[in-house]
């Protein structure tokens, strides 16, 4: 085991503070509408230019191990805020820096660190409760677009495209961000339920120009097993032929003579039919078949519930307005399922999302949720160069997280104003002793830091602006983009309450713990020997290289 170096008390905290400030100073340069960019070196390819706080934080590693520990702890604040709300990383870093700087001054002045921490915790709880009171629900497209715009560093085109995507696929819909091929951002929406399985035979295609099989007003037969024997299918096929409607078969697989017979019937025009494999595997396949059944008002034919293909009737089949199959995907549009059943299924899946611990399962469950509740939208990010594309894509993802958070917990006035208004909640707050009161006062100063930093980045005088904002009421604040004062919500400067709350909670949690640090332990840096090869002691003569005659 390598030797360790231990630092105590002030000397440890000073080193830690250096690391905190290096990281936070780099990150906070990006805050606000007039925040600057940070250029990150990459081991290969062009450097990356970013205004995303967490991207900057992730790049920073310091040579001095004690300083690095301070930097890594603040990095954790940014990551924690990012994990919970997907945005607010820069704000969280600025808050953490303010808490640590103010807190370590108080510790150096002889205050009890544990009481300071208790004071900070008490004030945090009060401010979080007040932020919830300040929050207004965010339901209309205009507010959603404004939240997206602010999060994407005042880029209104990003805010508008996210608002449009949310309007089209609903609040529960899945919105994914991909790299586009043009200069403009594009939005494409898949309405209805789409799953990644295509037709089992190209002979099902009835639109050769687009290479798709399209069924209008079809019946859907959902089967939880392989179908290889056509005899099992005959009763259903005859009933469907009499009804004169097309049929889509969704089964674990359709093979052999069953598939051949379906193809022949389809080509002769006896029954218009198409077959597709069920999506997913194992238990997930059963769950997804059940989703399709609920969406279309059908029943899954499964031996587990005592149903077999031979006994299946038209009552067991689902209905949809249209089904489109191509080589890779199947889309079911306007299933005829009961709204109450769909809502119950959505609630059940939402409960599973809350209960699961696996990120993979959570993602798959959310996909199922979106397919049932709305649809899937894809935002294709357009840019002139690869470097710009990466930077823009990161901003779109941030803005998307922010708008989701806004829909979830509402919005508060942006630009650091919500913190200043929430201070009323702790104006009368008292701790159990003087040191706790110092902790409360310390947080009171720290929550002004985001507003101060926004003003500094905009080239203004922070103290003057903070004072003026404090004199105002409600949503009155400072618009750094236009250097004006006014109603933040009317000017469209909104922050999601969830982002604001989780930024403070992450900063207070880690910041207050850092104040209570008394010792730091790190490995002793080894002095590596100077580079270069060892002395070769004069490489003697190479002898006569005689006898090289016969070489051509």
From Swiss-Prot:
Please name the Pfam families in this protein's record: Cpn60_TCP1 (PF00118)
Alphabetized UniProt keyword annotations: ATP-binding, Chaperone, Cytoplasm, Isomerase, Nucleotide-binding
Could you tell me what reaction this enzyme catalyses?
A: ATP + H2O + a folded polypeptide = ADP + phosphate + an unfolded polypeptide
What InterPro entries does this protein map onto? Chaperonin_Cpn60_CS (IPR018370), Cpn60/GroEL (IPR001844), Cpn60/GroEL/TCP-1 (IPR002423), GroEL-like_apical_dom_sf (IPR027409), GROEL-like_equatorial_sf (IPR027413), TCP-1-like_intermed_sf (IPR027410)
Can you tell me which residues bind ATP? Answer: 30-33, 51, 87-91, 415, 479-481, 495
- Where can this protein be found? Cytoplasm
Catalytic activity, EC: 5.6.1.7
An example of a GO molecular function for this protein is: isomerase activity
Listed under GO biological process in this entry are: protein refolding
Q: What is its main location?
A: cytoplasm
Q: Which Gene Ontology terms of cellular component type are present?
A: cytoplasm
Sorted alphabetically, which HAMAP family does this protein's record hold? Answer: CH60 (MF_00600)
Cited function: Together with its co-chaperonin GroES, plays an essential role in assisting protein folding. The GroEL-GroES system forms a nano-cage that allows encapsulation of the non-native substrate proteins and provides a physical environment optimized to promote and accelerate protein folding.
Q: Which proteins does it associate with, and in what oligomeric form?
A: Forms a cylinder of 14 subunits composed of two heptameric rings stacked back-to-back. Interacts with the co-chaperonin GroES.
- PANTHER family per record: 60 KDA HEAT SHOCK PROTEIN, MITOCHONDRIAL
User: Would you identify the family this protein belongs to, as annotated?
Assistant: Belongs to the chaperonin (HSP60) family.
Which protein is depicted? Chaperonin GroEL
Query: What lineage is this protein's organism placed in?
Result: Bacteria, Pseudomonadati, Pseudomonadota, Gammaproteobacteria, Pseudomonadales
Name of the gene: groEL
């Amino acid at each position: 085991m390598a030797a360790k170096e231990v630092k105590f008390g002030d000397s440890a905290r000073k080193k830690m503070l250096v690391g905190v400030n290096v990281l936070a100073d780099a990150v906070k340069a990006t805050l606000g509408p007039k925040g600057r960019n940070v250029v990150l070196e990459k081991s290969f390819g062009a450097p990356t230019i970013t205004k995303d706080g967490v991207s900057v934080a992730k790049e920073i590693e310091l040579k001095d191990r004690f300083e690095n520990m301070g930097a890594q702890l603040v990095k954790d604040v940014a990551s924690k805020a990012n994990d919970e709300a997907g945005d607010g990383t820069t704000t969280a870093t600025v808050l953490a820096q303010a808490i640590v700087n103010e807190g370590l001054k108080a510790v150096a002045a002889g205050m009890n660190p544990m009481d300071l921490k208790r004071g900070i915790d008490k004030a945090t709880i009060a401010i979080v409760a007040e932020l919830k009171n300040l929050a207004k629900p965010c339901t209309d497209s205009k507010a959603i677009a404004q939240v997206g715009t602010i999060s994407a560093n005042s880029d209104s085109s990003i805010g508008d495209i996210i608002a449009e995507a949310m309007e089209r696929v609903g609040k529960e819909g899945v919105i994914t961000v991909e790299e586009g091929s043009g200069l403009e951002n594009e939005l494409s929406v898949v309405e209805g339920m789409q799953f990644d399985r295509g037709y089992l035979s190209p002979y099902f295609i009835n639109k050769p120009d687009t290479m798709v099989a399209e069924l209008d007003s079809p019946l859907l037969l959902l089967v939880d097993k392989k179908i290889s024997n056509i005899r099992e299918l005959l009763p259903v096929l005859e009933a469907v032929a009499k009804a004169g409607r097309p049929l889509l078969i969704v089964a674990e697989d359709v093979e052999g003579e069953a598939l051949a017979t379906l193809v022949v019937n389809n080509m002769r025009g006896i029954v218009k039919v198409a077959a597709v494999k069920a999506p997913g595997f194992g238990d997930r396949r059963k769950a997804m078949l059940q989703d399709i059944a609920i969406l279309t008002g059908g029943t899954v034919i499964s031996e587990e519930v005592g149903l077999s293909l031979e006994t299946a009737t038209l009552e067991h089949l689902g209905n949809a307005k249209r089904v489109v199959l191509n080589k890779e995907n199947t889309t079911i549009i306007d299933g005829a399922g009961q709204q109450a059943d769909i809502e119950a299924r959505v609630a059940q899946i939402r409960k599973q999302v809350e209960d699961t611990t696996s990120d993979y399962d959570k993602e798959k469950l959310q996909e199922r949720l979106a397919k049932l509740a709305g649809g899937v939208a894809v935002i294709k990010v357009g840019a002139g160069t690869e470097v710009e594309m990466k930077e823009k894509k990161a901003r779109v993802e941030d803005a998307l997280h922010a708008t989701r958070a806004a829909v979830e917990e509402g919005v508060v006035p942006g630009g650091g104003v919500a913190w200043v208004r929430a201070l009323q909640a702790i104006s009368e707050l008292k701790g159990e002793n003087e040191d706790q009161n110092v902790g409360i006062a310390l947080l009171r100063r720290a929550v002004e830091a985001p507003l101060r930093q926004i003003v500094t980045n905009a080239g203004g005088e922070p103290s003057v602006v903070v004072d003026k904002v404090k004199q105002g009421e409600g949503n009155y604040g400072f618009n750094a983009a236009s250097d004006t004062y006014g109603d933040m919500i009317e000017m469209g400067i909104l922050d999601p309450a969830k982002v604001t709350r989780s930024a403070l909670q992450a900063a207070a949690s880690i910041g207050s713990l850092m104040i209570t640090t008394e010792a730091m332990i790190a490995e002793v840096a080894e002095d590596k020997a100077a580079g270069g090869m060892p002395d070769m002691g004069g490489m003697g003569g190479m002898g006569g290289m005689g006898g090289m005659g016969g070489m051509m």
